[in-house]
Swiss-Prot record:
It comes from Arabidopsis thaliana (Mouse-ear cress). A motif (Nuclear localization signal 2) lies at residues 336-343. SMART domains: IQ. Belongs to the IQD family. This is Protein IQ-DOMAIN 8. The gene is IQD8. PROSITE patterns: IQ.
Length: 414
């Protein structure tokens, strides 16, 4: 029984030794903020534990454990001997770092809040802008849809004068020129604006007609043969078939491509049509107006058979002579006249009077009868194919008589 009791005692003593070693190891851990009282307590405990065995080492202690205890005691003694001022400085530094960390955290939180606020404001503002843009685009699209609906309804309704609706089909689509010729106008505006536009179109058509008449009067006048005259008349009648012919200029083609303005100008263009009719009648009779001694006369391009050679040479000489195209050379009837520097002087007029009087005295009865018949034919042609304005001028200024001697002299010169 004695052996069993010793075993129990040894087990209990070993447990106590193990717990003491663990406590020592825990206390040996380094603490930065160990107070002075704790250091003193630990040192006093160490000295007390050592005081009983001072000078008489225990039997169970080993040399390495003794050396470890000596190093620990030396470190504790150094800590105790250190002045208390160093600990205050360390505490201040530690407090400063803590304060700086807290202040920096506060600044970071404040900046984060400001950033969140800015982002929120930007999101709100951009959202408003996006909503405004979406609203504007939606309004524009609605306006376009309304305009398209109105245009379609207007096209389906057709003209407002009670006519039948025209069915839209590709085969029955009218030409835009014909639509404009009918008078259809879908331009927006009031009645006054439409009337002003129509008036402007009429004025433009009048100006174009005047320009056309001016261009026709400035063309060089020739003496064509009857076959050529009939061909030119047929070309003028057939507008659409021979626009590429040399008789058509750019103005004729341009005016012929605008039938609507021609119909609009049926009323106010009677004067221009009368002028053109008078010109066509003059061209049909193949007459040429010649100015001699400030007297306007018309000479037939086809003279009587007795004096055909003389008159043909005279007409060819007058038609082939170049005439400068300027507005100052036109008379009221639209024919050419010579400029002032080409008119005869007084001396030449006097010579012509003397030669005319001498020739009239020495004229034979046959020549007198021939000149009378020729002048009568000229007067008949003048009364048949001239306008009243030219008749007034011819009444004021009678035509000069052409004698057989003058005609024979001119034929000899030619």
């Amino acid at each position: 029984m004695g052996g069993s009791g010793n075993w129990i005692k040894s087990l209990i003593t070993n447990k106590k030794n193990i717990t003491d070693d663990q406590e020592k190891n825990i206390k040996k851990k380094w603490k930065l903020w160990r107070t002075s009282s704790e250091g003193l307590i630990s040192s006093s405990k160490g000295f007390k534990s050592r005081g009983g065995s001072y000078g008489t080492p225990s039997l169970g202690s080993d040399p390495p454990s003794f050396s470890a205890d000596d190093s620990f005691t030396a470190a504790v003694a150094a800590v105790i001997r250190a002045p208390p001022k160093d600990f205050f400085l360390v505490k201040r530094e530690w407090a400063a770092t803590r304060i700086q960390a807290a202040f920096r955290a506060f600044l970071a939180r404040q900046a984060l809040r400001a950033l969140k606020a800015v982002v929120r404001i930007q999101a709100i503002f951009r959202g408003r802008q996006v909503r405004k843009q979406a609203d504007v685009t939606l309004r524009c699209m609605q306006a376009l849809v309304r305009v398209q609906a109105r245009v379609r309804a207007h096209c389906n309704r057709g003209p407002s004068d009670g006519q039948e609706l025209e069915k839209p089909s590709d085969q029955q689509k009218d030409d835009p020129a014909k639509q404009a010729e009918k008078g259809w106008c879908d331009s927006p505006g009031s009645i006054n604006e439409v009337r002003t536009k129509l008036q402007m179109r009429q004025e433009g058509a009048i100006k174009r007609e005047r320009a056309m008449v001016y261009a026709l009067t400035h063309q060089p006048r020739t003496c064509p043969s009857p076959a050529k005259a009939s061909k030119q008349g047929s070309v003028k009648k057939n507008n659409g078939s021979c626009k590429s012919s040399p008789g058509w200029n750019w103005l004729d083609r341009w005016v012929a491509d605008r039938p609507w303005e021609g119909r609009l100008m049926e009323g106010p263009t009677n004067s221009s049509e009368n002028a053109r009719k008078s010109e066509s009648s003059v061209s049909e009779h193949d007459t040429v107006q010649v100015r001699k001694n400030n007297l306007t006369t018309r000479v037939l391009a086809r003279p009587p058979p007795m004096s055909s050679s003389a008159t043909s040479s005279e007409s060819s000489s007058t038609s082939q002579s170049p005439v400068p195209f300027s507005g100052s050379f036109l008379e009221e009837g639209g024919y050419y006249r010579k400029p002032s520097y080409m008119s005869l002087t007084q001396s030449i007029k006097a010579k012509q009077r003397r030669s005319g009087s001498s020739s009239s005295c020495s004229k034979t009865p046959f020549e007198k009868k021939q000149s009378m018949s020729y002048n009568g034919d000229v007067n008949v042609r003048r009364s048949a194919g001239s306008d009243p304005l030219n008749n007034q001028w011819t009444d004021l200024y009678p035509p000069a008589q052409v004698t057989g001697r003058h005609m024979w002299a001119k034929s000899q010169r030619g």
